[in-house]
Amino acid sequence: MRGLGLWLLGAMMLPAIAPSRPWALMEQYEVVLPWRLPGPRVRRALPSHLGLHPERVSYVLGATGHNFTLHLRKNRDLLGSGYTETYTAANGSEVTEQPRGQDHCFYQGHVEGYPDSAASLSTCAGLRGFFQVGSDLHLIEPLDEGGEGGRHAVYQAEHLLQTAGTCGVSDDSLGSLLGPRTAAVFRPRPGDSLPSRETRYVELYVVVDNAEFQMLGSEAAVRHRVLEVVNHVDKLYQKLNFRVVLVGLEIWNSQDRFHVSPDPSVTLENLLTWQARQRTRRHLHDNVQLITGVDFTGTTVGFARVSAMCSHSSGAVNQDHSKNPVGVACTMAHEMGHNLGMDHDENVQGCRCQERFEAGRCIMAGSIGSSFPRMFSDCSQAYLESFLERPQSVCLANAPDLSHLVGGPVCGNLFVERGEQCDCGPPEDCRNRCCNSTTCQLAEGAQCAHGTCCQECKVKPAGELCRPKKDMCDLEEFCDGRHPECPEDAFQENGTPCSGGYCYNGACPTLAQQCQAFWGPGGQAAEESCFSYDILPGCKASRYRADMCGVLQCKGGQQPLGRAICIVDVCHALTTEDGTAYEPVPEGTRCGPEKVCWKGRCQDLHVYRSSNCSAQCHNHGVCNHKQECHCHAGWAPPHCAKLLTEVHAASGSLPVFVVVVLVLLAVVLVTLAGIIVYRKARSRILSRNVAPKTTMGRSNPLFHQAASRVPAKGGAPAPSRGPQELVPTTHPGQPARHPASSVALKRPPPAPPVTVSSPPFPVPVYTRQAPKQVIKPTFAPPVPPVKPGAGAANPGPAEGAVGPKVALKPPIQRKQGAGAPTAP
């Protein structure tokens, strides 16, 4: 039976060649029946935020004669904390909402037994996505409505029939924007490791036009398509130590908000102009991407601005040109690469793509071949690192709000969140020996696991360089010896002289630099006389300015696409992105000796420079752009007056005044505790001494009952007392001792009984019941009355007389049916 079960399992995992193609877009494929591996048992009632899809899932499927085991984890970082969706309601009004229960079915992972493998799939309605093994990229999608266990097609990208696509960013425009590149700049990186810098984050906003909505048919289908695409893009960028987080989705289900032209350059300019007008109304983001169902002219499938990330021009347009979402995901990753400063691989001599030529090209190839790319080339990584050195890229260092990521903190998502000391990804992908990937806690003996000031699981010593100086307006940063992260990036003090200008927030703005940024390398600042013009909307020029802080005037270069210009003589003014005004001279630009443009006027440097800031740094540092001391290596902030080693040593022991405060606080607490204890004890003592009712032998009711009812045999019987009252033995020759008490008796003591010959009185029989507790008096117990006429001491017993006096004992208790007590 077991052999039959294994045979059936093997039959399920082996692929079956389909007798016919399900659609004409696929040239060759294999039919597989994925088998989901049983996961660990969980409670039936899952928390609501976990949704219907598990955090982890594994599938076994067969393709190309092999059985592949895919281990997947839900991409909890796919959606940002403030993720919103915008669409048009039935009444025509625009609706923006944050969906509740943002659970999804998009996963990332790896293939068991294959190093450097990758997988990105959705499990919403069957399996759809890709998994990479070595240089082979396998695509999978369902063939029927059988769900995850139904028939699926597995094929390689080159077997998907599609037209070749190209990037609309021309090589000429790239060359003019990026300048010449040599092979020496792009030496191959040793190994295939991630960059050692901190993780960068792209907060993405996606717009879907009406043509795409009509093609997919519903808002739900659009949402699913976009999440699939972004999930793939995020997976592609993870190898560059980047994360792509979707913070907003806008679906034009009614009509387009601007004209989507078949000309991709026009559509891009319309997108950026619309974004500039709507930016304050939309979720804050770093990059906007349009996905359109419009067929662009020629072979172009994407168009983007180069090196525009973190600016108002940060965006791109993408044609949804493939039935498989991996196709548009690769296009979006390519265009986003242009936004990050990357050039086409073909334009760089010596650029190396680690992919085999027959397996496909890298992501930044100028055209898409028969297979989808899956990695970035060496030169693309070098371009990226160069872009990240610019002050412009600062927006990428801002991580999303980790405390509000959709799904909450999850160990293994590469985000160090609440309750975690480190996060190196899932156990199968983690290569960081300083971090326990299953608990996201530091390994035993490790001080750190991440950060540029962390080396071999230890924090680097104070004074080691962790961020070098990039240019004249930058400052180098050093490790402080206590934290694994490099201190915040700081710049020279605003107003510090630099090449042809003065530093301002880490840049050296000059007129020539600004003209080159807009008009390309050939752009130059126009003659000084041009700056005396003020250009009003509609290209109305008026000559009355007395400084050079009005409209930016340039000459030479190439006119930017989608921008209108105003030409006055040899002066060229460029319209802003929204077309409502003309580009001004940026703040901080030099307008004369010791003068800069500030709030539209040419003013003295002292408008933002403190004359005595650096004097506070004790000659061991300089003032930075925040008017704070930036200390030299080994010196401690805030005023660079002490060495870091001295500060760290002093921090190991508490200051004297802190010790004094702690001692005084301890004394006060002990005193208060003593007062409280004393008051409680005193109150208990007083409560016991509040006039207790005295129980005396003379007031014992049993005494009176015995004396009045039954005379004692031959003398007075000892009065009955409670079990806790002891009366000392009194001899006849001793006087009776009265109790030392100030309480006066209200009635005289009873007269001694007369000796009568009578049978002994019966002793009452009591049930076994606990005697009633009485308060023990604080004075001596009473002495029983002495028999009158007592003779000499110690008389011998005589007939009819009682024996010596003994302490009063409680009545003898007998069980029912017992005989009468015998005389003692």
Swiss-Prot record:
- Binding note for cofactor: Binds 1 zinc ion per subunit.
Describe its function.
Possible involvement in extravasation of leukocytes.
Stretches of the chain found on the membrane's Extracellular side: 17-655
**Required cofactors, per record?**
Zn(2+)
Pfam families, A to Z: ADAM_CR, Disintegrin, Pep_M12B_propep, Reprolysin
Q: Which PANTHER family match?
A: ADAM A DISINTEGRIN AND METALLOPROTEASE DOMAIN, DISINTEGRIN AND METALLOPROTEINASE DOMAIN-CONTAINING PROTEIN 8
EGF-like domain span: 609-641
- Which segments show compositional bias classed as Low complexity? 788-804
Naming one, the record's GO cellular component terms include:
podosome
Which stretches of this protein does UniProt put in the Cytoplasmic compartment?
677-824
Top EC class for this record: hydrolase
| InterPro entries, alphabetized | ADAM_Cys-rich (IPR006586), Disintegrin_CS (IPR018358), Disintegrin_dom (IPR001762), Disintegrin_dom_sf (IPR036436), EGF-like_dom (IPR000742), MetalloPept_cat_dom_sf (IPR024079), Peptidase_M12B (IPR001590), Peptidase_M12B_N (IPR002870)
The reply on keyword Amino-acid biosynthesis is no
Question: What is this protein's record name?
Answer: Disintegrin and metalloproteinase domain-containing protein 8
| Membrane topology category | Single-pass type I membrane protein
Tissue specificity of this protein: Expressed on neutrophils and monocytes.
Where on this chain does Zn(2+) bind?
A: 334, 338, 344
Which PROSITE patterns does the protein's record reference? ADAM_MEPRO (PS50215), DISINTEGRIN_1 (PS00427), DISINTEGRIN_2 (PS50214), EGF_2 (PS01186), EGF_3 (PS50026), ZINC_PROTEASE (PS00142)
Q: Which CDD domains match?
A: ZnMc_adamalysin_II_like
